[in-house]
């Protein structure tokens, strides 16, 4: 089997969301890295390989999750299965039109995605594009987090591009200092950082988007894209900085996973040979 052109590393969770019936919930599967792969799959030719590395339990929900991934033409073979573990789960509740989230992920199998690093090493060696996020880092133990970043550093080269979406979620981290140390370490092995100004202001106290870009470039990233809601995004690629206004959307249907979809468009565009500036949606 051909190895993936694009490899994502992260967690896929069970989603319970309100349905048309007030007494029932709709089950789905979602997670930031997987969402990006899912949307990228829609944009890429069917014969281009996309792979997802995580860890699964040995329960029925894990079986259903693996079937779901395969049905969408994303490869999750050669991935650890952990006895006694199950997928993480989150539930969406609506109150006065506002969404809130409750999470259950303590025994998520994905926390042990580094259980057999040789499986991941083989995939990294053949992937053209590597994609991970701050949530990927947050769910791992410090030792596994360090190992993952060391493995990425070993394969990073001129013909391979590493994407990192900082996706700062403070509640996933033991404390702010551990989060900042991990994000800095990821920035040092990343080619393209994808982030949002709101996240970076909360996590690092940056005053504006240029300050965010300067920090990541100083750590070793080659390019940085900072989104700012309906305001223009900032792309800094080496010494070149460009402000990119978003396409006008008068009435968004749903902002869920909007950042993941943005990243998918960039990933698919660069996989097709576009420059980073050309590929930004």
Annotate each PLM feature:
Residues 1-72, 252:
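Glycine-rich phosphate/adenosyl-contacting loop at the front of the ribokinase-like
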Residues 10-12, 135, 166, 261:
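Active-site metal-binding loops of divalent metal-dependent hydrolases
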């Amino acid at each position: 089997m051909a190895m993936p052109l694009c490899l994502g590393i992260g967690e896929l969770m069970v989603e319970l969301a309100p349905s048309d019936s007030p007494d029932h919930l709709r089950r789905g599967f979602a997670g930031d890295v997987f969402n990006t792969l899912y949307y990228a799959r829609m944009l890429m030719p069917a014969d281009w390989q996309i792979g997802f590395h995580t860890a699964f339990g040995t329960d029925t929900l894990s079986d259903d999750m693996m079937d779901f991934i395969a049905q969408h033409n994303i490869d999750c073979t050669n991935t650890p299965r952990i006895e006694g573990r199950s997928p993480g789960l989150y539930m969406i509740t609506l109150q006065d039109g506002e969404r809130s989230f409750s999470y259950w992920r303590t025994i998520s199998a994905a926390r042990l995605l580094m259980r057999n690093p040789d499986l991941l090493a083989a995939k990294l060696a053949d992937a053209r594009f590597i994609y991970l996020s701050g949530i990927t880092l947050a769910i791992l133990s410090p030792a596994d987090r360090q190992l993952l970043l060391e493995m990425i550093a070993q394969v990073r080269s001129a013909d391979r591009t590493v994407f990192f979406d900082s996706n700062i979620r403070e509640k996933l981290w033991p404390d702010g200092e551990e989060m900042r140390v991990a994000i800095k370490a990821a920035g040092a092995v990343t080619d393209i950082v994808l982030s949002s100004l709101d996240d970076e202001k909360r996590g690092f106290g940056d005053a504006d988007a240029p300050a965010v870009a300067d920090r990541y470039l100083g750590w070793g990233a080659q390019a940085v894209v900072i989104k700012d809601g309906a305001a223009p995004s900032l792309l800094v690629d080496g010494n070149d900085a460009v402000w990119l206004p978003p396409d006008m959307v008068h009435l968004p249907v749903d902002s869920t996973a909007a950042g993941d979809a943005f990243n998918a468009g960039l990933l698919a565009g660069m996989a097709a040979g576009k420059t980073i500036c050309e590929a930004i949606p």
